[in-house]
Regions:
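Metal-dependent catalytic neighborhoods of phosphoester/phosphodiester hydrolases
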Residues: 191-192, 215-223, 251-253
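Short, solvent-exposed turn/loop segments enriched in Gly/Ser/Thr/Pro and often Arg
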Residues: 181-189, 238-248, 265-266
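Terminal accessory/targeting
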Residues: 1-180, 185-188, 233-234, 250-256, ...
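Acidic, His- and aromatic-enriched active-site or binding-groove loops in soluble protein domains
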Residues: 200-210, 257-273, 281-283
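Glycine-rich phosphate-binding "P-loop"
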Residues: 150-155, 203-219
Length: 375
């Protein structure tokens, strides 16, 4: 994998579109950007200085600030996923931490809150509104202040068996979510899909197999691509999230989806760490990218040993204050063990006490993003 083909993927004016400032004169935008550039990380500042806003967009929204080969699997990671099926769970966890996760400099992106691009965006919008007596585009429809999006990845048979436990908690709190199933790992009954659709939930695809190899090479990705697209059609699914958030923004353009959520604003704990720094959705080529912005439940539970939604709620407060998208990914495979579901239940209860949020399914956010992108 490499960064080849990335140039031009976002289209022209991605930063201007994301910030909702297309109605302003380019000269005014340039002045506002110049005044806010110091808020960005050094690699993003260099990209802006060398290649303007198009360079900044690629550095941030396509993660080019981490290098042209950021998405390339290392030899150790390739080996790990070849032997992973034969390893016990504890050995997999140790190897994942020590071998698979590449080291990202501690000063690269902050976690769980990365506020530098957010501050940059807000500064540019504020300066333009103050100097030009015009309004920037709203972040969200109908006067909503921020967005709340709930998603689930079902990794295996245990998660499938306990999925309804999670969804029952959501329904009782008045929420609906998107559920991503692996294409070829376990049987997903048609009756379950019909029930989810009837209840107002969304269905998405969680890769072809949960073996870490969907993106291991271009040839294997292309081999699995037709089957993934076929499963998307069979399930009437519009969205995708890659297992283990392995990703390649160029290859993914061939997926028949309207949205993806394989990227994140910041996460040092994923096999490909880094992040797009954006707490808002944006168009990534032919689909809307909805980065998850709340810490992964696996990280909180298995890695950090958290027993409360404390970090989720801290990040939620930040996202609400900055009109962001609070997109959480919860796995029934993890939260339905050892009484952990109460952690998610408490989180949802706290969300209901917030004011002004837009509770939306990913497909609704994708539609809004496409509409806003063209405004």
């Amino acid at each position: 994998m490499s960064g080849e083909g990335v140039s031009g993927l976002l289209g022209s004016g991605a930063i201007v579109r994301l910030l909702g400032v297309r109605a302003f004169e380019p000269e005014a935008v340039a002045r506002a950007v110049d005044g806010a550039r110091g808020l960005l990380p050094e690699p993003a500042q260099r990209a802006l200085a060398e290649s303007g806003l198009e360079g900044l967009a690629e550095a941030v929204l396509l993660e080019r600030q981490f290098g042209a080969h950021h998405f390339a699997p290392s030899p150790s990671r390739r080996l790990y996923y070849h032997v992973r099926p034969f390893l016990p769970a504890k050995a997999r966890a140790l190897l994942r931490r020590g071998v698979v996760s590449r080291t990202v400099p501690s000063d690269s992106l902050h976690w769980p809150i990365e506020d530098r691009f957010v501050s940059f965006a807000e500064r540019v919008r504020a300066v333009l509104e103050e100097s030009c007596s015009m309004r920037t585009l709203p972040w969200w429809p109908s006067g909503h202040s921020f967005a709340v999006v709930l998603t689930h990845d079902v990794e295996g048979p245990f998660g499938l068996a306990h999925l309804m436990d999670v969804l029952t908690v959501e329904r009782e709190a008045g929420f609906r979510s998107s559920v991503s199933f692996v294409g070829d790992a376990y049987d997903v009954p048609d009756s379950l899909l019909r029930e989810l659709r009837a209840e107002g939930f969304e269905i998405a695809l969680h890769g072809w197999r949960h073996d870490g190899r969907d993106f291991s090479s271009g040839s294997l990705f292309n081999q699995r691509l037709p089957r993934m697209n076929q499963r998307l059609r069979e399930w009437q699914a519009l969205g995708f999230r890659s297992p283990m958030t392995h990703r390649n923004p160029v290859w993914m353009q061939d997926l028949d989806v309207t949205w993806d959520s394989s990227f994140f604003d910041t996460d040092p704990y994923e096999p490909i760490p880094g992040g797009v720094m954006s707490v808002w959705p944006y168009m990534m080529g032919r689909f809307a990218e909805l980065p998850y912005t709340l810490p992964q439940d696996h990280t909180l539970i298995e890695t950090l040993g958290e027993t409360s939604p404390r970090l989720w709620l801290e990040k939620l407060d930040f996202l609400a204050a900055h009109h962001g998208m609070a997109l959480v990914n919860v796995h029934p495979d993890y939260v339905c063990r050892n009484g952990r579901l109460s952690m998610y239940e408490e989180f949802l209860e706290e969300v209901t006490h917030r004011a002004g949020y837009w509770h939306a399914l990913p497909r609704d956010v994708a539609s809004w993003t496409l509409e806003r992108w063209g405004s």
